[in-house]
Amino acid sequence: MRILITNDDGIASPGLRAAVRACRSVGEVTVVAPATQQSGVGRSISLLEPVRVEEIEVEGVDALAISGTPADAVLIGAFSIMDEPPDLVVSGINLGENVSADVTTSGTVGAALEAYGNGIPAIAISQEVRDARARVDNNAKNVDFTLAIRVLKALLEAIRGANWEGVLNVNVPDPDRWNGEIKVVPLAFTMYRPRIEKRYDPRGRRYYWIDGEIIQDPPEGTDLYELQRGSIVITPLTTDVTGDLDAAENVIKELRRALRG
């Protein structure tokens, strides 16, 4: 199995190193990842500027650090660096969970969807991090990836045997909280209640920090609900985001009447 690994936390992330350790025991690994933190960029790609690359080493594997996004990394890795597109893309292991429909903003999930959109199956895997500071700290020493590595290894073997062709969004609780359950569940509607903080710089110019408060009462049976209760949660994803066509048609009827005068 030929595996392309990327992430959105950047090439120096301990989660990326953990993913490399998991994957290289199962297949042939290629690593292409952003040079810097890219959380929140979703599936965006770099169209208006070149993507620079730097050759480095990650866990003994030759790797490329790129100036672009996780989706850029997938495109460059799959269609330029590798002789042929990979059998699978692994995005992660992300520092912090990626659950609910808010995954649309995740660079980790965005990379997996970019792979799927180009005919490559993918896994987006994220690790619950209880220390908020560790989510953006590439020197974090207190994140235990042992369970996530076990999950990823087992999934790779399962996918190889099952001929999986889609995207799996995988979220792993802190090992100390795992209740022994693995749940295949739908996405919650949202994970955060928006929290916008307005500030002023020393020159009186206004600026904002965008943040959010994690919802503590999500609907039962959703990924956020089950993760908060200590389960490993897995959600199959697709790039088809088509909504309710019948409901839209009711609205469009009024539009047709208005335009026909």
From Swiss-Prot:
<keyword id="KW-0479">Metal-binding</keyword>
<dbReference type="InterPro" id="IPR036523">
    <property type="entry name" value="SurE-like_sf"/>
</dbReference>
<dbReference type="InterPro" id="IPR002828">
    <property type="entry name" value="SurE-like_Pase/nucleotidase"/>
</dbReference>
<protein>
    <recommendedName>
        <fullName>5'-nucleotidase SurE</fullName>
        <ecNumber>3.1.3.5</ecNumber>
    </recommendedName>
</protein>
<dbReference type="Pfam" id="PF01975">
    <property type="entry name" value="SurE"/>
</dbReference>
<keyword id="KW-0963">Cytoplasm</keyword>
<comment type="function">
    <text>Nucleotidase that shows phosphatase activity on nucleoside 5'-monophosphates.</text>
</comment>
<dbReference type="GO" id="GO:0046872">
    <property type="term" value="F:metal ion binding"/>
</dbReference>
<keyword id="KW-0547">Nucleotide-binding</keyword>
<feature type="binding site">
    <location>
        <position position="8"/>
    </location>
    <ligand>
        <name>a divalent metal cation</name>
    </ligand>
</feature>
<dbReference type="GO" id="GO:0005737">
    <property type="term" value="C:cytoplasm"/>
</dbReference>
<comment type="similarity">
    <text>Belongs to the SurE nucleotidase family.</text>
</comment>
<dbReference type="GO" id="GO:0008253">
    <property type="term" value="F:5'-nucleotidase activity"/>
</dbReference>
<feature type="binding site">
    <location>
        <position position="39"/>
    </location>
    <ligand>
        <name>a divalent metal cation</name>
    </ligand>
</feature>
<dbReference type="GO" id="GO:0000166">
    <property type="term" value="F:nucleotide binding"/>
</dbReference>
<dbReference type="InterPro" id="IPR030048">
    <property type="entry name" value="SurE"/>
</dbReference>
<feature type="binding site">
    <location>
        <position position="9"/>
    </location>
    <ligand>
        <name>a divalent metal cation</name>
    </ligand>
</feature>
<keyword id="KW-0378">Hydrolase</keyword>
<feature type="binding site">
    <location>
        <position position="94"/>
    </location>
    <ligand>
        <name>a divalent metal cation</name>
    </ligand>
</feature>
